C-alpha cells in the first residue's frame, strides 16, 4: 500500500477504445489510510467519471484499476472541451469560476477541468459557465460526477445525502 501523506499516480478507467480495450487515466492521489488502502483524489479527472477532487477512494487493486468510492468531498467536477485552442476561453472562465470558489485542476490544449463545491449552488455554477461560454460556440461543458455513468443523463443525487448529514 501507499504510506500516509504520500502522493502518487494511480490508473483509473477512463473508457474503452474501438476494440473494446480499456483506456486508463492517471490521477494524482494522496494516501489517507495505508492500512485500509484509502486515498484522496488531488484533482478532478478529465475522463474518468463519477469522481471529483477530494473524493476518498478505497484501492481494491491498483494494478487492475479497481477502486470503490468511499466518501464524496462535495466537489463537482466540471469538464470543458473545445474544438479550438482553449487559452482564450480559459482566460475568461477561470477567473469567473475562481470568483465563486472554483479551482482549475487541469489545463490541456483542448480541455479544462475545474472543481467547485456543490454548496455554491447548481444554478450559480451553471449560470457562470454558460455566461463565460456564450462567446465560444466551439466549446461545451459537462459535469463529470453528477450523472449516472451508465446512461449519462440520470442525476445521481449524491449531494442530497450530504445535505441530510
Where are these regions (language model features)?
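Extended boundary segments
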Residues: 1-21
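Helix-rich terminal scaffold detector
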Residues: 86-165
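Short glycine-/aliphatic-rich beta-strand segments at the starts of folded cytosolic domains
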Residues: 70-84, 112
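Short, charged beta-turn/beta-strand-edge "cap" motif at the junction between a beta-strand
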Residues: 45-47, 60-67
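Short beta-strand-centered aromatic/proline hotspots
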Residues: 23-31, 44, 64
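Short, structured beta-strand/loop micro-motifs enriched in basic residues and often containing a Trp
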Residues: 33-43
Amino acid at each position: 500500500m501507499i504510506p500516509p501523506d504520500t502522493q502518487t499516480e494511480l490508473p483509473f478507467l477512463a473508457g474503452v477504445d474501438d476494440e473494446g480495450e480499456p483506456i486508463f487515466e492517471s490521477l494524482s492521489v494522496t494516501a489517507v489510510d495505508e492500512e485500509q488502502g484509502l486515498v484522496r483524489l488531488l484533482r478532478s479527472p478529465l475522463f474518468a467519471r463519477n469522481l471529483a477532487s477530494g473524493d476518498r477512494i478505497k484501492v481494491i487493486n491498483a494494478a487492475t484499476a479497481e477502486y470503490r468510492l468511499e466518501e464524496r468531498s462535495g466537489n463537482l467536477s466540471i469538464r470543458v472541451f473545445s474544438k479550438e485552442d482553449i487559452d482564450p476561453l480559459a482566460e475568461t472562465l477561470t477567473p469567473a469560476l475562481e470568483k465563486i470558489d472554483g479551482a482549475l485542476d487541469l489545463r490541456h490544449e483542448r480541455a479544462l477541468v475545474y472543481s467547485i463545491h456543490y454548496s455554491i449552488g447548481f444554478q450559480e455554477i451553471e449560470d457562470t459557465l454558460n455566461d463565460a461560454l456564450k462567446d465560444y460556440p466551439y466549446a461545451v461543458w459537462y459535469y463529470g460526477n453528477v450523472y449516472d455513468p451508465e446512461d449519462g443523463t440520470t442525476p445521481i443525487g449524491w449531494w442530497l445525502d450530504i445535505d441530510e448529514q
